[in-house]
Amino acid sequence: MRTDTIAAIATGMCNSGIGIVRISGNEAFTVIDKLYRNKDGRKVKVSQSRSHTVHYGFIYDGDEKVDEALVLIMKGPHSYTAEDTVEIDCHGGILMVKKILEAVIHAGARTAEPGEFTKRAFLNGRIDLSQAEAVADVINATNEYALKSSVSQLSGSVSKRIKELRSRILYQIAFIESALDDPEHISL
């Protein structure tokens, strides 16, 4: 698996009030420290703050002020991907969100492949395969039943049931092996 730092637009490609650019990987904090300045325009290492904090300021690309933003810091493994993660909440115009993503790429990240954040969450043990599949199902749900089912699967209901069945099967296998090894001491 590649361990580089990835970035992508997390919101849809449409004009809206807010757009989100997500960054994840070993250099996510290095990237944001190159781009972020506080409300007074001073460079501040937001990466040194506690996990799960929000910072108001501005995103710069070099000396050019790109946009006003909120920056969320999530230190791994306590993030969706279980890696260091940053979310930049900016104004949601398509052009603005693309400019923020370009600044992130200039600062050292690469554009994520479709589904790569979820792939990393799976590979890092943050979610299991059933939950990874449920992410796509939640996104693509077209009715209430499909959405409810997908959310249940995302919360681990299918995985829990599989673990229960696995445990029961292993118990039965142990019972059968014991009966084969010493049939006189097994009562049915």
Describe every region a protein language model picked out:
Residues 144-188:
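Flexible nucleotide-interacting loop at or near the entrance of a catalytic core
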Residues 1-148, 152, 156:
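A glycine-rich (often HGG/GG-containing) alpha/beta subdomain
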